[in-house]
């Protein structure tokens, strides 16, 4: 599996995972913290791991995104290809609440509790790391 970038259609940000556990979006394609590895747990279920830090994208019980040192149930996301060819990533452990990974127009992460289907903030395009 080649590493990928997660490009958000809302403002053109790449999802970034910092070593300190913070998650946000950046428009800098050369940022080392935006390279992500996807691991399929089962069909449509993925772990998203930072290549640089080795941490996993996770969503806590308040809907906040953070980076986890090890893969837990909070790190499992339901990956779905939508009609517009963008993907959405819904927290599996909070699936009954419909909480999605999202980035706001200012590049900050959107709490899962504030996301809902149809928002641009939750639409992501997995892109290859190299632009060539």
Swiss-Prot record:
Single GO MF descriptor: integrin binding
Main location: secreted
PROSITE patterns, per database record: HBGF_FGF
Annotated positions binding heparin: 10, 108-120
Coiled coil: none
Cellular compartments per GO CC: cell cortex; cytosol; extracellular region; extracellular space; nucleus
Keywords, ordered alphabetically: Angiogenesis, Cytoplasm, Developmental protein, Differentiation, Growth factor, Heparin-binding, Mitogen, Nucleus, Secreted
A Gene Ontology biological process term: positive regulation of cell division
Pfam families referenced in this protein's UniProt entry, alphabetically: FGF
Keyword presence, Secreted: yes
Function noted in UniProt: Plays an important role in the regulation of cell survival, cell division, angiogenesis, cell differentiation and cell migration. Functions as a potent mitogen in vitro. Acts as a ligand for FGFR1 and integrins. Binds to FGFR1 in the presence of heparin leading to FGFR1 dimerization and activation via sequential autophosphorylation on tyrosine residues which act as docking sites for interacting proteins, leading to the activation of several signaling cascades. Binds to integrins.
PANTHER family: FIBROBLAST GROWTH FACTOR
Family: Belongs to the heparin-binding growth factors family.
Identification of the protein by name: Fibroblast growth factor 1
Annotated source species: Notophthalmus viridescens
Encoding gene per record: fgf1
């Amino acid at each position: 599996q080649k590493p990928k970038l997660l490009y958000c259609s809302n403002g053109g940000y790449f999802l970034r995972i910092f070593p300190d556990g913070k998650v946000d979006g950046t428009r800098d394609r050369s940022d080392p913290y935006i390279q992500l590895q996807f691991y399929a747990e089962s069909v449509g279920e993925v772990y998203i791991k930072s290549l640089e830090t080795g941490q996993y994208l996770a969503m806590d019980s308040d809907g906040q995104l953070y980076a986890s040192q090890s893969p837990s149930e909070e790190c499992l996301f339901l990956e779905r290809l939508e009609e517009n060819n963008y993907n959405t990533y819904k927290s599996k452990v909070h699936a009954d609440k419909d909480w999605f990974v999202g980035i706001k127009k200012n590049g900050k992460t959107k709490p899962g509790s504030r996301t809902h289907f149809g928002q641009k903030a939750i639409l992501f395009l997995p892109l290859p790391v190299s632009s060539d």
